[in-house]
Amino acid sequence: MGEMNGEGQIEVLENDIRTLRKQLQEKVQQLKTLKKHFQKNCITKLNNDEIARYSRQIILSEIGVQGQLKLKKASVLVVGAGGLGCPAALYLAGAGIGRIGVLDYDEVELTNLHRQLLHTEATVGLTKVTSVQSYLEQLNSQIEIETHHAQLTSENALALLEPYDVVVDATDNVATRYLLNDACVLLRKPLVSGSALQLEGQLTVYNYRGGPCYRCLFPTPPPPESVTNCGDGGVLGAITGVIGALQALETIKIILSNEGVLAGRLLLFDGQQSAFRNLKLRPKKPTCAVCSEAPTLTKLIDYEQFCGMRATDKDAALTLLEPCERISVRDYHDGWLAAGRDHLLVDVRNANQYEMCQLPGAPVNVPIEDILSNRRTEELLARAQQAQLPVYVVCRRGNDSQLAVRHLAPLFRERNLPAPRDLIGGLHAWTKTIDPNFPIY
């Protein structure tokens, strides 16, 4: 009987705790709303909490009270809540930017956590903008954090960017860079652009006080197959931290109208050597399609079509080969691997990635760089000629393998050998279709 009473008491207490937690959340939300209302109606002076919080930067001659008020009145949109966006948003929030918008279409994944440090294991599966908002609101409850869980497109870009003073480009694909550039030029807003790949980073400011825009320097996009993002090429988290923090710094300097803004200059960071370099960029192009006196581009266009690639870094798939030059992972598995038929499988990932995981069947590792530079093509040709076996090529996502097949096919035909074939979708397709326990990265 006593045991039943104990269980009943536990249930009552648990219900009470749930009720109290709900009430607490409601009170916290009321407090946030009240603070935001107070902040919006008190932008001409700093309160005691703000003076204490920002005192270490207010005492700088470059900032002062008036500078802090400028930061309080300012609004910044951070496009991308990843490796660059996280540190940029973090330092902007810490500095007291009054209103910060965070735009991202993605959800938090385990692969993000080594470099996107506003996200945690507890927020895996949540939208990135929700994760960032939660962190920043705990850091600084006196500022306003707006979230936009959406993919930036030609249809929504102008409306999303228009309410903000400065835009931070923390994205990882070419199409979005062109879109952001053109939208910022049309809206007359400065664009703080950063990028990070492997152990290197870059930073500049476009469309600021007569400086060049992105199109002035790059009027036409690069070939899709030549573009590498951090998902394919890799990146060290500390590199994105450095560049993202510097993006916040440039944004703050713009808001304060301070000297030294990186307009017309490109900052290069070499993480391997811990070295910074500043390069002078070409001036604003008089015939630029979007920022010249007589622009030919006066509205946003289809940037995926313009660049020949998707405006996302999520498993962007190239189609470089004819269907007869490719094979699905299912057909390869059932028709060759599981059937035990002799063949040669070539894995074109680099040695580090190859060491992480390999398909069964003892594939030969020949990195794509060694194929495209012909360093090891003779080795492959000799092996194929000696064995007289069909050759299949695999990579991580099915893009580099197509480049390899396109390069190797004419060389194979010259020796009267059947051209190699590409495994569609690469190892990602293998995990999704054949073996869900195969590592994905």
UniProtKB/Swiss-Prot annotation:
Q: Where does Zn(2+) bind?
A: C213, C216, C288, C291
| EC number(s) stated in the UniProt entry for this protein | 2.7.7.80, 2.8.1.11
Could you tell me which PROSITE patterns the record lists for this protein? RHODANESE_3 (PS50206)
Can you cite an annotated GO cellular component?
A: cytoplasm
Kindly identify the residues recorded as the active site.
Answer: C230, C395
| Residues that bind ATP | G83, D104, T111, N112, L113, H114, R115, K128, D172, N173
The record's free-text note on cofactor binding: Binds 1 zinc ion per subunit.
> Which class of enzymes does this protein belong to?
transferase
- Reaction(s) the record says it catalyses: [molybdopterin-synthase sulfur-carrier protein]-C-terminal Gly-Gly + ATP + H(+) = [molybdopterin-synthase sulfur-carrier protein]-C-terminal Gly-Gly-AMP + diphosphate; [molybdopterin-synthase sulfur-carrier protein]-C-terminal Gly-Gly-AMP + S-sulfanyl-L-cysteinyl-[cysteine desulfurase] + AH2 = [molybdopterin-synthase sulfur-carrier protein]-C-terminal-Gly-aminoethanethioate + L-cysteinyl-[cysteine desulfurase] + A + AMP + 2 H(+)
User: Which SUPFAM superfamilies does UniProt cross-reference here?
Assistant: Activating enzymes of the ubiquitin-like proteins (SSF69572)
Biological process terms in GO annotation: Mo-molybdopterin cofactor biosynthetic process; protein urmylation; tRNA wobble position uridine thiolation
Among the GO molecular function terms of this UniProt record, one is:
URM1 activating enzyme activity
Where is this protein localized, as stated in its record? Answer: Cytoplasm
PANTHER family tied to this protein: ADENYLYLTRANSFERASE AND SULFURTRANSFERASE MOCS3 (PTHR10953:SF102), UBIQUITIN-ACTIVATING ENZYME E1 (PTHR10953)
Reported function: Plays a central role in 2-thiolation of mcm(5)S(2)U at tRNA wobble positions of cytosolic tRNA(Lys), tRNA(Glu) and tRNA(Gln). Also essential during biosynthesis of the molybdenum cofactor. Acts by mediating the C-terminal thiocarboxylation of sulfur carriers URM1 and MOCS2A. Its N-terminus first activates URM1 and MOCS2A as acyl-adenylates (-COAMP), then the persulfide sulfur on the catalytic cysteine is transferred to URM1 and MOCS2A to form thiocarboxylation (-COSH) of their C-terminus.
Name recorded for this polypeptide = Adenylyltransferase and sulfurtransferase MOCS3
Q: Which organism is it from?
A: Anopheles gambiae (African malaria mosquito)
